[in-house]
Each structure stands twice: as C-alpha cells, then as structure tokens.
C-alpha cells in the first residue's frame, strides 16, 4: 500500500523498534517510517478495512501487518492505548 512512498529500510527500522510485545508507540512508529501527516491520514484510510470512517479495535490490532505480512499483532493493551491517544 505504501510502495514508492516509504523506503523498505524505514519500514524495517520502524517494525524492529516495536518488535517486542507492548513496545508499540504510534508516534514513534510513524516518525521512524518518515510518514508526513497527510500520509498518516492516507494510511488510516487503508487500514479502515470496512470503510466505516473509523478504525475499529480489530483493524488497529493488525496495524503492523499493513507494513509487513509477518509483523506481529498489537496486544490488547497497545491497541487500547493507541485508540485513546490517536
């Protein structure tokens, strides 16, 4: 979804930075990817799988897999924190 927008090295670095359980911070992740605020908006439209205009908990849980199919799912705690702070 982000081919040509993000460098593979940036994606790998961002994923490595949150590989450990309960280490995900969405601001740090987007910064590591080099996403601009406009690109972040586009990204959220992509992970809104049901096109409801909202990011549901289950969609957010699989957030990292949008960047790499082998990435881990977010924990319940990480998902809840991201929903509250986003």
Curated annotation (Swiss-Prot):
Location of the EF-hand domain: 35-70
GO molecular function: calcium ion binding
GO cellular component entries: cytoplasm
Keyword Ligase: no
Binding site for Ca(2+): 48, 50, 52, 54, 56, 59
Keyword annotations of the record: Acetylation, Allergen, Calcium, Metal-binding, Muscle protein
InterPro entries reported in the protein's UniProt record: EF-hand-dom_pair (IPR011992), EF_Hand_1_Ca_BS (IPR018247), EF_hand_dom (IPR002048), Parvalbumin (IPR008080)
N-acetylalanine, modified sites: 1
Disulfide bonds: none
Miscellaneous comment: Is regarded as an important allergen.
Job description of the protein: In muscle, parvalbumin is thought to be involved in relaxation after contraction. It binds two calcium ions.
Family, similarity comment: Belongs to the parvalbumin family.
Protein name: Parvalbumin beta 3
């Amino acid at each position: 979804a982000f081919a040509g927008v993000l460098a593979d090295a940036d994606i790998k670095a961002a994923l490595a930075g949150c590989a450990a359980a309960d280490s995900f911070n969405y601001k740090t992740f987007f910064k590591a990817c080099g996403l601009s605020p406009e690109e972040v908006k586009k990204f959220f439209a992509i992970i809104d799988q049901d096109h409801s205009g909202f990011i549901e908990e289950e969609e957010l849980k699989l957030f990292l897999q949008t960047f790499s199919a082998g990435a881990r799912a977010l924990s319940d705690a990480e998902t809840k924190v991201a929903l509250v702070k986003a």
